[in-house]
């Protein structure tokens, strides 16, 4: 595709460096919406809203909002799924080939700026970083569904990955291909799940929710491992194509996600199975919820 071949990641990077304040404004406006949007929408519509936390999305899927909102969400989620599938088909095979042909160290720690900022791989890495801005639309859709509050994990994940991606694309990172490959792969499945749920088939895909969350947790585990590996190589003197500031941010991001996604998984899928048995007044038993 011509627009992929003509991609100039260097120009995009330079623009992002010159306009680094823009990501601050976007993040500030987004956070203001997180805390005021649901209340404002509830006042306008006269509804109290409802909060529903879906395991994979940190915010609910399926059944809420008007028909127009649900249709828009189907198209939105399908678009993100298709986008992620295209990204996966380019970035993930490249990472796997690099590991098989060059070894884990070279694939993780050798920074090839030409591959990072140009070529078809560079295009999908670049648009991956930029895609964290439109992905904030997820939150707007949750508010339009009538959610009265937005889960911490939902908005924390969105705003931190946006800031991290902007920083990483500006400084360059040999490890960012791991971030893109894993995120693209998981999002290919996750957003398809949400699209099907919004079509009215939540009961069909619901059994797959815990497995999607497990994939997300494994993504965070691998992210922590890759970052710690890069830190170790940098400390031992062999070096790694990641700056220390970026590695620290990346480790903090992945470690916090690992904790939050694991906590969500336990609350959504483990604790309900071990809920205490309650006794009714008539002597019958039921599992408490």
From Swiss-Prot:
Pathway listed: Lipid metabolism; fatty acid biosynthesis
Keywords from the UniProt entry: Endoplasmic reticulum, Fatty acid biosynthesis, Fatty acid metabolism, Glycoprotein, Lipid biosynthesis, Lipid metabolism, Membrane, Transferase, Transmembrane, Transmembrane helix
Coiled coil: none
Membrane topology category: Multi-pass membrane protein
Protein location: Endoplasmic reticulum membrane
InterPro entries attached to this UniProt entry: ELO_CS (IPR030457), ELO_fam (IPR002076)
Identification of the protein by name: Fatty acid elongase 1
Species of the source: Trypanosoma cruzi (strain CL Brener)
